[in-house]
Amino acid sequence: MAIVYAVVARGTVVLAEFSAVTGNTGAVVRRILEKLSPEISDERLCFSQDRYIFHILRSDGLTFLCMANDTFGRRVPFSYLEEIHMRFMKNYGKVAHNAPAYAMNDEFSRVLHQQMEFFSSNPSVDTLNRVRGEVSEIRSVMVENIEKIMERGDRIELLVDKTATMQDSSFHFRKQSKRLRRALWMKNAKLLVLLTCLIVFLLYIIIASFCGGITLPSCRS
């Protein structure tokens, strides 16, 4: 899965969170949240560490953050964050401004996970952003090294256990293989039916030629 972690927070207060990998991602993200300026409420940011990029969307007094593989680009992760932002505000609105930590986690972590899988496996989902003309805005977001906001003593090495990611990739591979086998089986079944009909038709033509015509008059007497 290309997007492996997501969180919705108010300042440093985490309201909902989901991780598809094990490791210390949550600890690194909390350090990032601590370093974000509380005075800025609307912005897009990107910070890289190792082979991952932290994509950040700040809007409506909340922070929407996801971590994705650095080869996945920026458009789809930000499309994911826009979708999460829309769904979160629709479900909770201003309630989130006073909610305690993890108040929405039981319900919304499932949404984070479902949309994470959808956007990771459907790279074309950023089409809407292209129509909206947001591509140029996303391109203007510079990917900064995480050291830009982290002081030397604050930085935590990002440790990600890829086992979960590999298991997830294996699951998707098996799912795609099963779908492909089903499609090939259907294709072969259709071909077999067509071939059977063709053989029956040819046999009928041969029998008809020996029996005096289409109605087989010679063979009836």
From Swiss-Prot:
This is Vesicle-associated membrane protein 714. Belongs to the synaptobrevin family. It comes from Arabidopsis thaliana (Mouse-ear cress). Residues 2-190 are cytoplasmic. Residues 127-187 form the v-SNARE coiled-coil homology domain. PROSITE patterns: LONGIN, SYNAPTOBREVIN, V_SNARE. It is a single-pass type IV membrane protein. The chain crosses the membrane at residues 191-211. Coiled coil: none annotated. Residues 212-221 are vesicular. Highly expressed in leaves, stems and roots. Detected in flowers. It is found in: Golgi apparatus membrane.
